C-alpha cells in the first residue's frame, strides 16, 4: 500500500521535504536528501519514531533521521508518461526493494532532475509542490511480478 505525500523542494538545503496528505498533515515534514538514497541500517530506524502521525501505508524508514530508503519520485499526474518514457526506473527501484545493486546515486539524481524538475520548469509552476508516492523498501517489502506493476497509482 502506498501513501500520498506532498513534496516541496527546499533550495536552501537542496532537499525534498515530504509531508503526508491527510487530516494530520500539519506535522513536521520528513526530509530526504537527494544525495543520500542508500538504505539505512535497521538499527538506525526507530520503530516508534513518527508513530504518533497515525499514517497507514508509510514504511517505518519514512520517519528515520536518515530519510526513507526508496522514494518513488513519480507524480500521479505524470506516472504514465514518466514510466513509459523511462522503463529503467521501475526496474531500478524494484531491484532496490530486493536489496540488489541497481543504479548509482548520481544516475538517480539525474533522473529526478531531468524528469521532474524539468516538468515544473516547463510548466512555469512557481510553487514546486506535487503529490508523490512513497513506499517499496526493505522495511516494507512490496513484491511485484513485473517491474511495470511496481508503481502504485495514488
Curated annotation (Swiss-Prot):
Annotated gene: X
Name used for this protein in its record: Protein X
Major localization listed first in the record, in broad terms: host cell
InterPro entries listed in its UniProt record: Transactivation_prot_X
Quaternary structure and partners: May form homodimer. May interact with host CEBPA, CFLAR, CREB1, DDB1, E4F1, HBXIP, HSPD1/HSP60, NFKBIA, POLR2E and SMAD4. Interacts with host SMC5-SMC6 complex and induces its degradation. Interacts with host TRPC4AP; leading to prevent ubiquitination of TRPC4AP. Interacts with host PLSCR1; this interaction promotes ubiquitination and degradation of HBx and impairs HBx-mediated cell proliferation.
GO BP of this protein: DNA-templated transcription; symbiont-mediated activation of host NF-kappaB cascade; symbiont-mediated arrest of host cell cycle during G2/M transition; viral genome replication
Region (Mitochondrial targeting sequence): 68-117
Job of this protein: Multifunctional protein that plays a role in silencing host antiviral defenses and promoting viral transcription. Does not seem to be essential for HBV infection. May be directly involved in development of cirrhosis and liver cancer (hepatocellular carcinoma). Most of cytosolic activities involve modulation of cytosolic calcium. The effect on apoptosis is controversial depending on the cell types in which the studies have been conducted. May induce apoptosis by localizing in mitochondria and causing loss of mitochondrial membrane potential.
Family to which this protein belongs: Belongs to the orthohepadnavirus protein X family.
GO cellular component: host cell mitochondrion; host cell nucleus
Keyword tags: Activation of host NF-kappa-B by virus, Activator, Apoptosis, Host cytoplasm, Host G2/M cell cycle arrest by virus, Host mitochondrion, Host nucleus, Host-virus interaction, Modulation of host cell cycle by virus, Transcription, Transcription regulation
